[in-house]
Amino acid sequence: MIVNEFEKLTAGKLLLASATMLESNFKRTVLLMCEHNEEGSLGFILNRPLEFKVREAIHGFNDVDDVLHQGGPVQVNSIHFLHSRGDLIHNSQEVLPGIYWGGNKDEVSYLLNTGVMHPSEIRFYLGYAGWSAGQLFSEFEEGAWYTAEATPDVIFSDAYERMWSRTVRAKGGAYQLIANSPELPGMN
């Protein structure tokens, strides 16, 4: 079932924690991979909202009432963003068609504060998830991860609690059973 999952992983794909992943940073997480090459991998957790708002955490974003998200356990004091406006934000890197990572923060602030860009077109993250060369491959061999296709609907979804099960279930077949498994299998 998990054969060749690692070979399917590229920038722009989703990385899904397997049901056996119990490590607290990644338990039942859905990540968007933004970089994946021989040097390592980098992505952002999509389904871990934090309890404070962007305007409370990032200077210059006074009108952004959306929640900030935990991007991952690496460099947790760094700010990153995913957005759909590569046409307006310079220095953005296209991750998949219509979805961009990063860009000019001052432009983002201006676009949001003037209403040219809507908060639903961007997500902000504290930190990121990162793996050194070979590390993620080893985790795949241990059965820690699955892959899936990314869509803007998943990336900008507010259904955080159901995101993992819905995304795993959408893979079909035996993954539908996995998606319905209890969080702590030994507790049922």
Swiss-Prot record:
Cellular component terms per the entry's GO annotation: cytosol
InterPro entries per the UniProt record, alphabetical: AlgH-like
Residues passing through the membrane, by range: none
Coiled coil ranges: none
Signal peptide boundaries: none
A Pfam family annotated for this UniProt entry: DUF179
Family the UniProt entry places it in: Belongs to the UPF0301 (AlgH) family.
Identification of the protein by name: UPF0301 protein Cag_1601
Source organism: Chlorobium chlorochromatii (strain CaD3)
Source lineage: Bacteria, Pseudomonadati, Chlorobiota, Chlorobiia, Chlorobiales
